Amino acid sequence: MRKLLFLFCCSAIAFSLKAQQTKTYAERLGWPKGARVLILHVDDAGMSHESDEGVEKAITKGVSTSTSVMMPCPWVPEIVKFIKEHPNTDAGLHLTLTSEWDNYRWGPLSGRSTVPGLVDKQGALWPSVEAVYFHASADEVDKEIRAQLERALSMGFKPTHLDSHMGTLFARDDYMEKYLKLGVEKQIPVMFPGGEDLFYRAEAKAGTIAELKKQGKYKEGMDIPAPANLAKAKETGAMLWKNGLPVLDDLHNSSYDWNMPGVDQKSDAEIRKWYTDHYIESIGRLSPGLTMVIMHCTLPSANFKYICKEGNKRKGDLLAMTDPRLRAFLKKNGFILTTWREVMERRIKAGNSE
């Protein structure tokens, strides 16, 4: 009898531990089991006037719940003014280490002489993640992201979170270490998918397969490795949680790879339908947990084409976020919309609970 009781107790403990391990971060933050919680996040605020207009409209007229600001960019004062006039706006820092457009450039806030490895021959930040990877040290990256936070605070803008423009801070482990350290040190949430990452992994795998097929190298059933930056995702997520920060269960960052055929010849109604359909389909595939959905809502003017050629792609995001059909879909399917501000408040409330 005692042996049976002992075995029962051991089984109960094991079941309890397994249940804790399979809890989503959304559950640990107080949302019910099975909840699908979304941060609908607009990148690139401050990059241009058109970007700022897109952000403002997506948040005030649409379903978007959050944004992040590129502090080295020319239109930062405009978006910071909006944030201060609308204090409930959930706005973070889109930590920026690249300047990717040909005719519209910006440099580091920490000074070119302070971070020479971060600048190209024009004195601007490098145009690609690859160039940063091969030229910039982790110490230079650390100096620059801290300078960007310092500028925000000096403008009276206290960011609700940190994330990474073009994913540059995810390109090297030592960059990532500086990024995570800044968040923990300042107790500012960082964008990091530290859960099961089912959508992120599936989309990355599909992208790799598509590229291999294009190159004629794909063979049915071949092993497709997970993205390198997910190798220690769960371990890193646990570290962030232990240090008082919230963690994402998943990341939806595939919308920038969507290419509507002939988008520049389409009407707004056609663009809206195409993008809304894609958001409904992809969001519908998300598993329970806290997911950040990334987009680039923009209201392009006639001049925006001189910055980049993707104005209608970015407008597609805005048209989808303001489409009543998307709002109705989210409501009908029980999605919960949240912000980084609320997520951090819930993390503080959760305390040391596992």
What are these regions (language model features)?
Residues 28-30, 55-61, 78-90, 107-120, ...:
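Acidic (Asp/Glu)-rich catalytic clusters
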Residues 37-39, 64-68, 88-94, 159-163, ...:
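Structural preference for beta-strand elements that scaffold enzyme active sites
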Residues 190-192, 307-354:
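C-terminal domain-boundary segment and adjacent tail
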Residues 138-253, 260-261, 271-275, 284, ...:
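Catalytic domains of cell-wall/extracellular-matrix polysaccharide-remodeling enzymes
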Residues 3, 9, 19-39:
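N-terminal pre-catalytic segment of deacetylase/amide-hydrolase enzymes
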Residues 49-73:
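A short alpha/beta connector and helix-capping loop motif
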Residues 106-131, 210-213:
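Active-site gating loops and adjacent loop-to-helix segments of metal-dependent hydrolytic enzymes
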